[in-house]
């Protein structure tokens, strides 16, 4: 019995000493939040993404899942296809509340097989 009590004490002590971080404060690398957009101070959403998550903008090579015409992520505004990456230069950062990035496989599952190189989804403030 003393060994069992000692084990319980050790487990309780070790978990009490661990720093617990609330899930909400853990940064999601696939999301740029409204606070991040506002705090960045950039004029366009392209500038925000280029500064905070430049990997969203990189060339991904031929899309193996789609037979490949598209080699970069496609931009969606809310739930509709909006255009190529260059359209991000025309979107004011202040009009966007969140940016979500979907990798190729995640984009195919959510948006369809034409999006094998990923999707950058902009969530507008008016959505």
Give the ranges of each region predicted by the language model.
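Extracytoplasmic
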Residues: 27, 40, 68-72, 94-96, ...
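Periplasmic plug
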Residues: 65-105
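Short, polar/charged loop or turn motifs at beta-strand boundaries
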Residues: 27-46, 76-85, 124
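A beta-strand signature from Gram-negative outer-membrane beta-barrel systems
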Residues: 96-127
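Post-signal-peptide N-terminal segment of Sec-exported extracytoplasmic proteins
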Residues: 34-66
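Bacterial signal peptide processing site
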Residues: 18-20
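C-terminal motif of bacterial Sec signal peptides marking the signal peptidase cleavage site
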Residues: 13-16
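Bacterial N-terminal signal peptides that target proteins for export
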Residues: 1-7
């Amino acid at each position: 019995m003393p060994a069992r009590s000692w084990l319980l004490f050790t487990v309780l002590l070790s978990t009490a000493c661990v720093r617990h971080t609330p899930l909400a404060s853990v940064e999601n690398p696939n999301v740029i939040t409204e606070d991040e957009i506002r705090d960045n101070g950039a004029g366009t959403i392209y500038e925000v993404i280029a500064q905070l998550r430049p990997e969203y903008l990189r060339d991904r090579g031929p899309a193996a899942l789609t037979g490949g015409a598209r080699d970069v992520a496609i931009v969606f505004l809310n739930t509709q296809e909006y255009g190529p990456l260059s359209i991000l230069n025309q979107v004011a950062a202040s009009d966007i509340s969140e940016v979500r990035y979907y990798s190729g496989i995640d984009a195919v599952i959510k948006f369809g097989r034409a999006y094998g190189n990923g999707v950058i989804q902009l969530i507008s403030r008016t959505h």
